[in-house]
Amino acid sequence: MKNYLKPILLIYILAQCLTSMGINASPEPIKYQQPNNMQLTILLKGDEFVHWATTLDGYTVLNNKDGYYVYAVLDSNGDLTFSDIIASDQSKRSSKEVNFVNKLQKNLTFSKKQIIEFKNSVLKRDAQAKSTNMGGFPTMGTNNMLMILGNFNNTTTTYSQADFNNYMNMQGFNNGKGSFKDFYLEVSYGKLIVNTTVTIWVTVPHPKEYYGPSSKWSEFVYDAVVAANTQAGVDFSQFDNNADGLVDGIAVIHQGGGQEATANPNDIWSHSWNLSYAGYSTTQRTFDGVVVDAYTTQPELYGSGSTMSTIGVMCHEFGHNLGAPDFYDTDYSTSGQYAGTGNWDLMSNGSWNGTNGDRPAHPNPW
């Protein structure tokens, strides 16, 4: 394998590095449109930090700098890297491609060395970030939360403010499956009531593609917060429930689908983080006398279609806002799968229960 591919792969991995906590990849097959307009069906693995995919017959693929999913191979050091062969569904492979994949090992993953190098980079950032930790959402009582609907300056939204108000607050939402509020009322045994104020759709200053790289995700959130202040007239002081000078948590919906279910590198991967970790000063984050810091961000749509996002991802990310960690395969040692609490746990695979996450599992007792 050509040596020039190694630094590109390092950039690929580190581009995903945040000290955030996010959702694991959707377990459902994803239909991804390659830049040549051919459709490839893949299974996405991993999380917002490091992710890869496999074809339905088990060959590992990576998304290269041109937006193509190509077959992954091992270099002379045993590290996972890109080939120059564009991946296709099994039934659409040319004879050249068939000959190539017949020589490949299935279900390749990043080497231990790659993962250690990656984790060391993340842990260093994490230690720096957590020194500025500014708190989270109350775990009991009746509390207010803000949801900001953020549209890019080159996209059109599908669902309305009223739709998301129902999604967050309506008793028996989605034919009795329940809203976000219903979910947390149930799993807290009536001890946590979250009343969410949903803004109008506000428009951020850049196109969707600008915010695609992980280094821009927090910028999207900050731009949405500023837009909520100027375009929607939000009074942020209403969302400091314990009067400590901090907004306890903000949920930001972005137009379109999330990368965890689209496999598209131009989409934001749902996650929970803090604007202070991204370098925004207290002055920049102060609105109406309170400071904005902790946030979650989730998609408007499930995958690349037109179906509204389900509550599973939102409930998982809010779990981080309450202080819960991830319980899926966060060290990538089992190819993105973790039997553990699995489908029984909101903070593991249980956020995807039901149809694409419309009936998420309760969180574990952590």
Regions found by a protein language model. Name each.
Residues 8-17:
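Bacterial N-terminal signal peptides
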Residues 1-8:
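Bacterial N-terminal signal peptides that target proteins for export
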Residues 7, 47, 234, 328-332, ...:
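Generic macromolecular interface patches on structured domains
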Residues 249-251, 255-366:
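Extracellular hydrolytic enzyme modules, especially secreted metalloproteases
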Residues 4, 21-291:
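Zymogen propeptides/activation segments of proteases
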Residues 12, 137-138, 242, 308-312, ...:
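Short, charged/polar micro-motifs that form catalytic or ligand-binding hotspots
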